[in-house]
Amino acid sequence: MTHIIIDGDACPVVDSIIDLTTETGIFVTIIRSFSHFSNQLYPPHVSTLYVDDGPDAVDYKIVQLSTKDDIVITQDYGLASLLVDKVLIVMHHNGKIYNSKNIQQLLDKRYMNAQIRKQG
């Protein structure tokens, strides 16, 4: 069964995903660090899982929990690169699908931009 896992620390479309999946039978799991804790109540098909605030803790939990039938929503290219061959779909919150053909280019671009920022 398809399940949506959201990298919830910085995802601006959580509410939209929840609205779109209501009454579809698709379960949604939002994974967040404790520093992004929320008291917001969600419908029964939505669960929230909190992890420690450590670096990449949310990413590691998503990798651990995801299966071949899952859809993962993230804007983290590093996380996406770990999942493109593991899950059904990995996508950015803007709808861009990450795949084995485009992920290396995105990682290279991220690296080059970081190098430029270091140079000032």
Q: What is each PLM-predicted segment?
A:
Residues 2-120:
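Nuclease catalytic cores that cleave nucleic-acid phosphodiester bonds
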